[in-house]
């Protein structure tokens, strides 16, 4: 992947051969010679440690090598030197959102860069980079569950480039997450009409078929996605009813003692998938891919309900198909069942999503 960088002339006073040496760094990167890219960029930085182009290439190579902490530190150095460099800003945001995307704080930092870059792109009239910032913003907002806001960004992106498959795909995912299933179905089918080998479109059409109860179509779609990108879509781990129930029972037994006493009045159930009414009973709707849900009043609120008696007993539901699809191995599935039980028990205890995220139970 090439960094989001255009050829430009350094604004710093630098040796006359800087541009030629930067071209050599770029060539090394384009040929996949990442260590050579680092070596050449570091040699330039030894002579001019605030050369933004060299910092950009260095950060890009580090990101490709998976050395993300170093990449982000280097992007930070570069942005201090060139705070209004849109391509640099976009590359840093892409690293935060697309590469460190399982870290909510990183995604939010990336979204802040997207917002700034979007405004600067509008001001300068750079519609190409404006599209990229809007697309990345939509991806990041989907990742943190802000799917309605993601739709706004993605619709704006598609105004600039209506046929962009990546933006259309991300928009369709937002529709799915917002439980607008008929619109999502149409959107994914239209994407496949233009790009028949788009694996995520097949995967989501499989999820939609599964929700409709069309097991044959779901298997066909999941199979197509797996055939296209097997490492991205491994077959789900299936425990079977008895083994799954045992894993849930073990997870409850592992709860801290001071929590177990509250579980006596909680119904714990396992269902294949969340029902539409359960998802759309919240505003915004819950994700169709949720692993579990807590229903009822938290312990902290029960004392105010009829003198402590809650006429609507609390319940926790785990969704087996979503959990099995989430995990890559049997061990990972059993671990995730435990985490999900703890997550929903956290809601029982009155913790919100931010509290749970801070405790690593998101």
Predicted regions and their residues:
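Active-site scaffold of zinc-dependent metalloenzymes
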Residues: 288-338, 348-362
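Alpha-helical segment of the N-proximal tetratricopeptide repeat
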Residues: 14-53, 57-64, 91-105, 136-143
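Canonical positions in the second alpha-helix
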Residues: 43-44, 77-78, 116-117, 123, ...
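TPR alpha-solenoid repeat register
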Residues: 54, 88, 126-127, 133, ...
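TPR/TPR-like (Sel1-like) alpha-helical repeat modules
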Residues: 112-119, 193-203, 207-234
